[in-house]
Amino acid sequence: MIQRITRALSLCLLLFIPFHDIMAGEFMTRDSLNNTTDTLKNGFFHRFYRYFEQSNKVKEEKKFDFSIIGGPHFSSDTKLGLGVVASGLFRIDREDKTISPSNISLYGDVTTTGFYLLGIRGNMIFPKDRFRANINMYFFSFPSEYWGIGYDAGKDEDHKTEYKRLEQQVKLELLYKLAPNLYAGANLMFRNVTARNFDDITFLNGAKKNVNTFGPGLVISYDSRDFIPNPARGFFAQLEQQFFPGWLGNDDSFKRTSVDFRYYQKMWKGAILASQLQGTFNYGDTPWSMVSLMGGSYAMRGYYEGRYRDNDLIQFQVEYRQKIYNRHGITAWGGAGNVFPDMDKFKWKQTLPTYGIGYRWEFKNRVNVRLDYGFGKGVSAFYFGINEAF
């Protein structure tokens, strides 16, 4: 079974071979080309095998340990597509091995439905961990579906409209170390959402199709995780307060409070239990593009992201992660979530479940390629990505 999985994964991986290695010279006669065919084939597959065999080895001699992987995928939302992800690990202070390395991930995707995506995420840890900088930038174009705002709107499968969603976001964050594992700082966030080709524009209830949102925020966090992209132990807690005032050019003035708690515990050999409780709460005149969204590849997996949306969101998930053989692993998770207009109108009966299973392949040292299949209430979805969901 493991061999079959390995073969299947190898078939979908993209390997970029230097051009001069394949050509083996600027000019080649037909005879010389025939004579070197077997050599080139053997060289290609040897390099292919060695690339992925060595990709998860720690390379301390490299200033920037960078690798790339990609392949086809399928999901109920985006259909058949081709995704590419790249991961890099580095240390700003290469002599200090006591702190977690910095990491950066670049990702791109294109599918047969017309969806395309390009993004970058990263965490930079400065010498002695005095400062941390986080970056999250992306752009995508997606033929989307919109049910409206509120639980009742989302639960009606047929009450929806189609439109094309173009979204771009830049979020920069800088944190200062106040005490061991305790950080505080500020961020800036810009997001633009443009909705085009609505089948039924009445779903927006007169709201603007193009929404720009810009604002600063304050952050305080406690982080004892041993490795940010894939923790094996530790605790993470963060409180974030974002402001989007009208005087900064926002059409709608509102505020957002986000809380995030995560705990990681080693169990038996190769086993980790991870849990997360997360909430997002909006106050003021929140535009339709900035209300809290349920679903996607990081939480409440199985649900179409944004089918259920409202001012406020609370969600919880617990995931069991087990390494089974060499670089291969499996996961299983369960959880629940709820969207609601405000705390006074929270209803337990509107809580939705999520559960699923996943496969992990260690692409780089403690950096996993993630294949998940999630289930919700009458829905399911497949996800391909890099790094753990949380």
Features from the language model and the residues they span:
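Transmembrane beta-strand segments of outer-membrane beta-barrel domains in Gram-negative
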Residues: 26-55, 64, 134-138, 145-267, ...
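Bacterial Sec-dependent N-terminal signal peptides
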Residues: 1-32
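C-terminal outer-membrane beta-barrel translocator/porin domains of Gram-negative envelope proteins
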Residues: 216-221, 225-324
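Transmembrane beta-strand segments that form the barrel wall of outer-membrane beta-barrel proteins
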Residues: 55, 65-74, 99-112, 118, ...
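Membrane-embedded beta-strand positions of outer-membrane beta-barrel proteins
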Residues: 68-70, 86, 104-108, 133-137, ...
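Gram-negative/organellar outer-membrane beta-barrel architecture
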Residues: 58-67, 73-212, 368, 376-390
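Repeated loop/turn-to-beta-strand initiation elements of outer-membrane beta-barrel proteins
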Residues: 93-95, 129-133, 180-184, 227-229, ...
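Outer-membrane beta-barrel "beta-signal"
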Residues: 217-220, 357-363, 379-390
